[in-house]
Amino acid sequence: MQPTRILQGLKYRKLRLTTKDVNKGFYKGNRTGSMGTHTSYGTYKIDYTKVRTYVCPDLTGFKLTPFVSKTIRPVHDQFPGDKLGPKNPATYLARWKSENGLD
Protein backbone atom coordinates (compact mmCIF):
# COMPACT_ATOMS: atom_id res chain seq x y z
CA MET A 1 0.00 0.00 0.00
CA GLN A 2 1.39 3.44 -0.93
CA PRO A 3 0.44 6.91 0.25
CA THR A 4 -1.47 9.22 -2.05
CA ARG A 5 0.31 11.44 -4.56
CA ILE A 6 -0.18 14.54 -2.42
CA LEU A 7 1.41 12.91 0.60
CA GLN A 8 4.35 11.65 -1.45
CA GLY A 9 5.28 15.12 -2.72
CA LEU A 10 4.53 17.23 0.35
CA LYS A 11 4.99 16.91 4.04
CA TYR A 12 1.73 16.10 5.78
CA ARG A 13 1.93 19.16 8.01
CA LYS A 14 1.64 21.52 5.06
CA LEU A 15 -1.82 20.20 4.25
CA ARG A 16 -4.88 21.74 5.81
CA LEU A 17 -6.17 19.81 8.82
CA THR A 18 -9.60 18.30 8.42
CA THR A 19 -12.08 17.06 11.00
CA LYS A 20 -10.86 13.51 10.43
CA ASP A 21 -7.28 14.48 11.35
CA VAL A 22 -8.21 16.06 14.67
CA ASN A 23 -9.06 12.77 16.39
CA LYS A 24 -5.59 11.40 15.64
CA GLY A 25 -3.72 13.67 18.03
CA PHE A 26 -3.40 16.81 15.93
CA TYR A 27 -4.32 20.05 17.70
CA LYS A 28 -5.74 22.48 15.18
CA GLY A 29 -6.09 25.48 17.49
CA ASN A 30 -7.59 28.80 16.52
CA ARG A 31 -4.45 30.93 16.13
CA THR A 32 -4.97 32.97 19.28
CA GLY A 33 -1.59 32.30 20.85
CA SER A 34 -0.76 31.97 24.51
CA MET A 35 -1.28 34.75 27.02
CA GLY A 36 1.14 33.32 29.58
CA THR A 37 2.86 30.18 30.84
CA HIS A 38 1.98 27.11 32.87
CA THR A 39 3.86 26.85 36.15
CA SER A 40 5.17 23.68 37.74
CA TYR A 41 2.45 23.99 40.41
CA GLY A 42 -0.35 23.52 37.90
CA THR A 43 -1.39 27.16 37.73
CA TYR A 44 -1.28 29.56 34.81
CA LYS A 45 0.63 32.83 35.02
CA ILE A 46 -0.54 35.59 32.69
CA ASP A 47 2.15 37.59 30.91
CA TYR A 48 0.61 41.04 30.54
CA THR A 49 2.99 41.97 27.73
CA LYS A 50 1.21 39.34 25.59
CA VAL A 51 -2.33 40.38 26.51
CA ARG A 52 -4.12 42.31 23.79
CA THR A 53 -5.35 45.75 24.80
CA TYR A 54 -7.69 47.85 22.71
CA VAL A 55 -7.63 51.64 22.97
CA CYS A 56 -10.88 53.44 22.26
CA PRO A 57 -10.37 56.50 20.05
CA ASP A 58 -11.50 59.97 21.07
CA LEU A 59 -15.24 60.18 20.38
CA THR A 60 -15.74 63.92 20.79
CA GLY A 61 -17.38 65.22 17.66
CA PHE A 62 -18.39 61.70 16.59
CA LYS A 63 -21.52 61.91 14.44
CA LEU A 64 -23.07 58.49 15.12
CA THR A 65 -25.30 58.08 18.17
CA PRO A 66 -26.21 54.98 20.19
CA PHE A 67 -29.36 53.06 19.33
CA VAL A 68 -30.91 53.78 22.75
CA SER A 69 -31.14 57.31 24.07
CA LYS A 70 -29.43 57.98 27.37
CA THR A 71 -32.26 60.30 28.46
CA ILE A 72 -34.90 57.54 28.68
CA ARG A 73 -35.51 56.42 32.24
CA PRO A 74 -36.48 52.81 33.00
CA VAL A 75 -40.18 52.33 33.67
CA HIS A 76 -41.06 50.37 36.80
CA ASP A 77 -44.56 48.88 37.05
CA GLN A 78 -46.73 49.84 40.00
CA PHE A 79 -48.40 47.11 42.06
CA PRO A 80 -50.48 48.89 44.73
CA GLY A 81 -51.79 46.61 47.48
CA ASP A 82 -49.96 43.54 46.19
CA LYS A 83 -47.37 42.03 48.52
CA LEU A 84 -45.60 39.94 45.88
CA GLY A 85 -45.49 42.73 43.32
CA PRO A 86 -44.17 41.50 39.95
CA LYS A 87 -43.70 37.97 41.34
CA ASN A 88 -47.45 37.39 41.73
CA PRO A 89 -48.49 34.64 39.26
CA ALA A 90 -52.10 35.85 39.07
CA THR A 91 -50.97 39.32 37.99
CA TYR A 92 -48.67 37.77 35.39
CA LEU A 93 -51.45 35.60 33.93
CA ALA A 94 -53.90 38.50 33.85
CA ARG A 95 -51.40 40.67 31.98
CA TRP A 96 -50.53 37.84 29.60
CA LYS A 97 -54.22 37.27 28.78
CA SER A 98 -54.83 40.98 28.22
CA GLU A 99 -51.85 41.31 25.84
CA ASN A 100 -52.18 37.99 23.97
CA GLY A 101 -55.92 37.47 23.99
CA LEU A 102 -56.00 33.67 23.98
CA ASP A 103 -55.78 31.35 26.95
Curated annotation (Swiss-Prot):
Biological process terms in GO annotation: translation
GO terms for cellular component: mitochondrial large ribosomal subunit
Localization: Mitochondrion
Keywords linked to the UniProt accession: Mitochondrion, Ribonucleoprotein, Ribosomal protein, Transit peptide
GO molecular function: structural constituent of ribosome
Quaternary structure annotation from Swiss-Prot or TrEMBL: Component of the mitochondrial large ribosomal subunit (mt-LSU). Mature N.crassa 74S mitochondrial ribosomes consist of a small (37S) and a large (54S) subunit. The 37S small subunit contains a 16S ribosomal RNA (16S mt-rRNA) and 32 different proteins. The 54S large subunit contains a 23S rRNA (23S mt-rRNA) and 42 different proteins.
Functional note: Component of the mitochondrial ribosome (mitoribosome), a dedicated translation machinery responsible for the synthesis of mitochondrial genome-encoded proteins, including at least some of the essential transmembrane subunits of the mitochondrial respiratory chain. The mitoribosomes are attached to the mitochondrial inner membrane and translation products are cotranslationally integrated into the membrane.
UniProt record similarity statement: Belongs to the mitochondrion-specific ribosomal protein mL41 family.
Name of this chain's protein: Large ribosomal subunit protein mL41
Gene for this chain: mrpl27
